[in-house]
Amino acid sequence: MPNFEQNQVIAVGLSGGVDSSVAALVLKEKGYEVIGLFMQNWETDSKDPFCTAEQDLSDAKAIADHIGIPLYVVNFSKAYWNHVFQHCLDEFAQGRTPNPDVWCNREIKFKSLLDHAKKLGATHLATGHYACIQNENNEYRLLKSNDSHKDQSYFLHLLNQYQLANSVFPIGGYQKSEVRAIAKKRGFINHAKKDSTGICFIGERKFKDFLNEFLLAQPGNIETSEGKIIGKHDGIMFYTVGQRKGLHIGGRPDAGEAPWYVVDKDVKRNVLIVVQGYEHPLLYSQELTCTNLHWIRDTEPSFPLTCKAKTRCRQADQTCVVTRLDNDHCHVQFEHPQRAITRGQSVVFYLGNECLGGGIIN
């Protein structure tokens, strides 16, 4: 983490979780003036059993009081709906699988929240992300966290130079175990709080039930890769490539015992295509094309580019060659076949520890 002048004001996005809490503590103990910001991105009934916002706010208030910093609650639900949620609905409706966290970071946390922090007099916005920022001659680089298991650079690959220049990741150099140990030692009530998982606006409720509230499902056929109809689906928007659960087509007398997996979605015919076996060849591909390209540095890399890539956040880095097709499309050729490459997800590129940027798989 860079050293700033001691009189600088740094705003911290306090989520109520342990990571942002320790991030605020680290800054406070370094002598900075710290203010906390709690985002409300989703309007919900306070009695909603699946929404944790009320408890999260309570935890954030307790941590702010514990550390001795002010906490401001800011509502970005309208911006979130317009710039994140509506985009996700459009993607689901077209049979793709979007990643809301990627868009939320670019449009809400490091745009709306950063702007609000500036209005309050803060010079920078800090978050509890596991990633690092390096300033190299006034060009900012996004680097992986020291904790490879918790690294979140994948979700931050759409950030630009202005956003990185005005952001701080105080725990990027820590291990998650260290963060929890610090929180426990300091008596934080959330030191053992579980990490948030899944899509933030859905919470722990069933994905299918939630999506049904906003999109009209169109049931259709489930077919094998040979075109044989073997079942019915509830709507292809509910499924993603590589999915096994929820197909309800197992135990067929005319098929083996191997489980079925979604291999493709034919949106035009409203057909879900499946194959049997985790290692089925059709689940693997050695290439993809991507669009909506974003490069973190001001100048994009030279092509063809030999680098590493991820097509999902927890995946090990995969060697590939990236070739420019046109202004907004690249072809990615992997050294080894990749399982369950999914349209709508992000492919993110790395050189060593540096996140270069990425695009949307199409």
UniProtKB/Swiss-Prot annotation:
Site entry (Interaction with tRNA), positions: 129, 345
GO process annotations (BP): tRNA wobble position uridine thiolation
Active site, renumbered: 104 (nucleophile), 200 (cysteine persulfide intermediate)
Keyword tRNA-binding: yes
Top EC class, one word: transferase
EC number assigned by the record: 2.8.1.13
Cystine crosslinks: 104-200
Region (Interaction with target base in tRNA) residue spans: 99-101
GO molecular-function terms, A-Z: ATP binding; tRNA binding; tRNA-uridine 2-sulfurtransferase activity
Region (Interaction with tRNA): 150-152
InterPro entries in alphabetical order: MnmA-like (IPR004506), MnmA-like_C (IPR046885), MnmA-like_central (IPR046884), MnmA-like_central_sf (IPR023382), Rossmann-like_a/b/a_fold (IPR014729)
Annotated GO CC locations: cytoplasm
Localisation: Cytoplasm
Catalysed reactions, as listed in the record: S-sulfanyl-L-cysteinyl-[protein] + uridine(34) in tRNA + AH2 + ATP = 2-thiouridine(34) in tRNA + L-cysteinyl-[protein] + A + AMP + diphosphate + H(+)
Residues binding ATP: 13-20, 39, 128
Keyword tRNA-binding part of the UniProt annotation: yes
Keywords: ATP-binding, Cytoplasm, Disulfide bond, Nucleotide-binding, RNA-binding, Transferase, tRNA processing, tRNA-binding
PANTHER family named among the record's database cross-references: MITOCHONDRIAL TRNA-SPECIFIC 2-THIOURIDYLASE 1 (PTHR11933:SF5), TRNA 5-METHYLAMINOMETHYL-2-THIOURIDYLATE -METHYLTRANSFERASE (PTHR11933)
Role description: Catalyzes the 2-thiolation of uridine at the wobble position (U34) of tRNA, leading to the formation of s(2)U34.
Family classification: Belongs to the MnmA/TRMU family.
NCBIfam families per UniProt: PRK00143.1 (NF001138), trmU (TIGR00420)
Name of the molecule in the record: tRNA-specific 2-thiouridylase MnmA
Species of origin: Coxiella burnetii (strain RSA 493 / Nine Mile phase I)
